From Swiss-Prot:
Keywords: Isoprene biosynthesis, Manganese, Metal-binding, NADP, Oxidoreductase
Pathway: Isoprenoid biosynthesis; isopentenyl diphosphate biosynthesis via DXP pathway; isopentenyl diphosphate from 1-deoxy-D-xylulose 5-phosphate: step 1/6
Lineage, opening ranks: Bacteria, Pseudomonadati, Pseudomonadota, Gammaproteobacteria, Moraxellales
The name this protein goes by in its record: 1-deoxy-D-xylulose 5-phosphate reductoisomerase
Physiological role: Catalyzes the NADPH-dependent rearrangement and reduction of 1-deoxy-D-xylulose-5-phosphate (DXP) to 2-C-methyl-D-erythritol 4-phosphate (MEP).
Reactions accelerated catalytically: 2-C-methyl-D-erythritol 4-phosphate + NADP(+) = 1-deoxy-D-xylulose 5-phosphate + NADPH + H(+)
SUPFAM superfamilies named among the record's database cross-references: 1-deoxy-D-xylulose-5-phosphate reductoisomerase, C-terminal domain (SSF69055), Glyceraldehyde-3-phosphate dehydrogenase-like, C-terminal domain (SSF55347), NAD(P)-binding Rossmann-fold domains (SSF51735)
Record: residues binding Mn(2+): D151, E153, E231
InterPro entries in UniProt: DXP_reductoisomerase, DXP_reductoisomerase_C, DXP_reductoisomerase_N, DXPR_C, DXPR_C_sf, NAD(P)-bd_dom_sf
Top-level taxonomic group: Bacteria
Length: 398
């Protein structure tokens, strides 16, 4: 019997990699529902191949999608719109597995809906957990949802932890003999740039990651090290560990995806070629393993692996994220919202590369922190933070 999969963000890089794995295992998985924000022509081709029962697009894309469906004689797929549609498919009774791969805050409500419906949730949308934190984790416990990390680093940590670690007490302290988490970072494309060189970075340069094939937003986040900051926050929530037990290690080759240190002096690492199909396949099948077409690591090819500390003077975003996690409450929501606005402005060439962390820092300083008591107050603060960030960008000439 096949398991039914819903892919939120099917036309993105994670969505496409997920389809690649599902296509290799039609005896195990079927696609029930998909969503896309853009690339409607690509979405139609996906629908022709995988024949989902339901598709969700933004309201303004409905006419385009239905027109293309009519041209292709596709009449057996239901079309839904907007956030309501996303929540519907993420929590649908016929869905077993939800791939949460919508980028940014837009993925929060459908991801939370999947968790509250008790689904197996493959979490690729780190921003959803950065914003909702313990609300998301408590919902997973309350509804017996299985929240499995797809980010290569968190998936590596998950594989390197004791098998029952997620069931351990959530104290903020390392449990079951764990002493520290080592979160690896490639360092991005500008690892060896000077501060002066960083002021001249273009969006095109920032979107070219040296090791991974990713979307624009996450590529820019990787270049500023904000991606690693968001991943630090995600790790703290997923594994119930305080931020000072998480050390970021720059590892330019992206072969070791993260490590876990233990009290007996052991360090366990998960290694592999940098291909998102591996963590996706792991999360899909855990505790079993799926065959993929990712080649096994050739250790003779990588005779030297390098490690260094991150330069937080050149890349202040990492410390901003650590400070936001330490502050708790709504600070991570403010951080994430301001960063999304700043990255968007950078991609539109309204601000420079080094202005991205400045926008985030200004927004964090401008807004008062408070407890994250509900999803409603998180969404309210997200909206306010976006407005403050936009105003600041306008004030500096963006």
């Amino acid at each position: 019997m096949t398991q039914s999969v819903c892919i939120l963000g099917v036309t993105g890089s994670i969505g496409r990699s997920t389809l690649k794995i599902l296509g290799q295992h039609p005896d195990k998985y079927s696609v029930f529902a998909v969503s896309a924000h853009s690339r409607i022509s690509e979405l139609v081709e996906i629908c022709k191949q995988f024949r989902p029962k339901v598709v969700v697009v933004p309201e303004q894309k409905i006419v385009e999608l239905k027109t293309l469906f009519a041209q292709q004689n596709i009449s057996d797929i239901d079309v839904l719109a907007g956030q309501e549609g996303l929540v519907d498919i993420a929590s649908h009774t016929d869905v077993d597995i939800v791939m949460a791969a919508i980028v940014g805050a837009a993925g929060l409500l459908p991801t939370l809906a999947a968790v509250k419906a008790g689904k197996r949730v493959l979490l690729a949308n780190k921003e959803a957990l950065v914003m909702s934190g313990e609300i998301m984790m408590q919902a997973a416990r309350d509804h017996q949802a299985l929240l499995l990390p797809v980010d290569s680093e968190h998936n590596a940590i998950f594989q390197s932890l004791p098998h029952n670690y997620l069931q351990a007490d959530r104290t903020g302290q390392p449990q079951l003999g764990v002493s520290k988490i080592l979160l690896t970072a490639s360092g991005g494309p500008f690892l060896n740039h000077s501060l002066e060189q960083l002021t001249h970075v273009t969006p095109q340069q920032a979107c070219k990651h040296p090791n991974w094939s990713m979307g624009q937003k996450i590529s820019v986040d990787s270049a500023t090290l904000m991606n690693k900051g968001l991943e630090l926050i995600e790790a703290c929530h997923l594994f119930s560990i305080s931020e000072h037990f998480v050390t970021v290690v720059v590892h330019p080759q992206s072969i070791i995806h993260s490590m876990v240190q233990y009290v007996d002096g052991s360090t366990l690492a998960q290694m592999g070629n940098p291909d998102m199909c591996t963590p996706i396949a792991h999360a899909l099948a855990w505790p079993e393993r799926l065959q993929t077409n990712v080649p096994a690591l050739d250790l003779f090819e990588y005779s030297q692996l390098n490690f260094q500390a991150p330069d937080t003077q050149k890349f202040p975003a990492l410390n901003l994220a650590r400070q936001a996690m330490r502050a708790g409450g709504l600070a991570p929501t403010i951080l994430n919202a301001a960063n999304e606005i700043a990255v968007e402005a950078f991609l539109m060439e309204r601000i420079g590369f080094t202005s991205i962390p400045q926008v985030v820092e200004h927004t964090l300083e401008k807004l008062e922190n408070a407890a994250a008591e509900s999803i409603e107050c998180i969404l309210d603060k997200d909206k306010v933070a976006r407005s403050v960030a936009q105003q600041y960008i306008s004030s500096i000439g963006g």
